[in-house]
Swiss-Prot record:
The keyword Ligase does not apply. It comes from Polaromonas naphthalenivorans (strain CJ2). The gene is nrdR. PROSITE patterns: ATP_CONE (PS51161). GO terms for molecular function: ATP binding; DNA binding; zinc ion binding. It holds the Pfam family Zn_ribbon_NrdR. Negatively regulates transcription of bacterial ribonucleotide reductase nrd genes and operons by binding to NrdR-boxes. This is Transcriptional repressor NrdR.
Length: 149
């Protein structure tokens, strides 16, 4: 594997650990040239369904987009990175369990909201207020009232 620091092509695995949930393997590697260490993660290569946007365009599923939107909603909230990662894992498991080749972006958004609601009610409201594109304050009040119950 190529060293991210110096670009040398020969690195050595110095430590390997399996995650607690056995979903991925963490490896510590050391470069043969600069001797710096770095971490890599290996996970199974699975085919996620394509995401169908509202306008009909199809895009590949992008984990980074889900993580980014969840982190934005959870900004300055008492939720750890590990909890966010676990929530994304749940979303991905549900996506794969659908067994579909294509999933509407609205369905993916609902899965994200479901996980955010479990993690943090404020983050859920933040995400839903943008995702659902409320037309007026009454729609927002209704959402807040639902969450407050």
């Amino acid at each position: 594997m190529k060293c991210p620091f110096c670009g040398h092509l020969e690195t050595q695995v110095v430590e390997t650990r399996i995650s607690e949930d056995a979903e991925f393997i963490r490896r510590r590697r050391q470069c043969g040239a600069c001797e710096k260490r770095f971490t890599t993660y290996e996970r199974p290569d699975v085919s996620f369904p394509s995401i169908v946007k509202k306008d009909g365009r199809r895009t590949d599923y992008q984990r980074g987009k889900i993580l980014g939107s969840m982190r934005l909603a959870l900004r300055k909230r008492p939720v750890s990175t590990a909890q966010i990662d676990a929530a994304v894992e749940q979303i991905e498991e549900k996506l794969l369990s659908l067994g579909l080749r294509e999933v509407a972006s609205s369905r993916l958004g609902e899965l994200v909201m479901l996980e955010l609601k479990k993690l943090d009610k404020i983050a859920y409201i933040r995400f839903a207020s943008v995702y659902r594109s409320f037309e007026d304050i009454d729609e927002f009040k209704t959402l807040v009232d639902e969450v407050g119950r």
